[in-house]
Amino acid sequence: MPSISVRRLFDDNQYKLQLAWAAGNSGADNRIGVEADKPVLALVGHLNFIHPNQIQVVGLAESEYLNRLESGETGYQFGDLFDISMSLVIVANGLPVSPGLRDYCHKNDIPLLTSKLESPYLMDVLRIYLQRTLAASSVKHGVFLDVFEIGVLITGHSGLGKSELALELISRGHSLIADDAVELFRIGPETLEGRCSPMLRDFLEVRGLGILNIRHIFGETSIRPKKILQLIINLVEADDEYMKQLDRLSIRTETESILNVNVRSVTLPVAVGRNLAVLVEAAVRNYILQLRGKDSTREFLERHQTQLKENEQHNENRPD
């Protein structure tokens, strides 16, 4: 199961969430991870002793209860209620940290952070952050591009010209996200987000030219950090026999399953004389039209059927 350390969570959100260490620095390497029986959204919540969250957030009501607990009004002690398996405690709303909570976290190596932000907002941001960071992931070989604001993954065997095609599309104003190893994350039930590893960011390998820094050559707008994957274009090597067998009026919608998410796919034959960059742009434009409920193939077939019916009626009404 994917997990992250408290240290990384703190580093990634320190300024946005106004986080500060209060105690338990020795537990900075505690792991926060997805459990088999709990979704990511259940990792964060207000202080709960019955079903403890991995990240326990102390708000106004929880702080008041802890003060009563420390004064002995409840008849319980911290050790009776707290689960030492929790990964992190955050005191929100700019509230002071009670000495009892500070000592308990220090003794049990539980990181204790404070934040000036209100607890509901704090939890919302952390849930979104964890949902993206701990998302199920996969790596696909190909080139991931932003074409007409649509995330397009170009796949195919080595040597078919994926990088050259990507370079042509970038020169036409589209943007590169990742080359060679595209990292895909399922950030929602039906949503895949494609990213590039930090090591490969900005680079595109083109045979004969070597490794190119696309940002330096084409400018800042030629690079995107991430994009939702919406369309897969698979390049296949095509000979004369393949082209003869190709269904030229296919109305079947092809999809490819990645991390249990079905993504629309299009197969483009690679042959001498075919302008692949124009074909990719046309495929993306056609996909956008289909999202709007317009299907050119079905429209043509309907028009064809209408014409056939009109011809039949004309022949029936014609005198012998």
UniProtKB/Swiss-Prot annotation:
It holds the Pfam family Hpr_kinase_C. Residues 269-274 are annotated as: Important for the catalytic mechanism of dephosphorylation. ATP binds at residues 156-163. InterPro entries: HPr(Ser)_kin/Pase, Hpr_kin/Pase_C, Hpr_kin/Pase_Hpr_N, P-loop_NTPase, Ser_kin/Pase_Hpr-like_N_sf. The keyword Magnesium applies. Homohexamer. Both phosphorylation and phosphorolysis are carried out by the same active site and suggest a common mechanism for both reactions. Belongs to the HPrK/P family. HAMAP family: HPr_kinase (MF_01249). This is HPr kinase/phosphorylase. It comes from Neisseria meningitidis serogroup A / serotype 4A (strain DSM 15465 / Z2491).
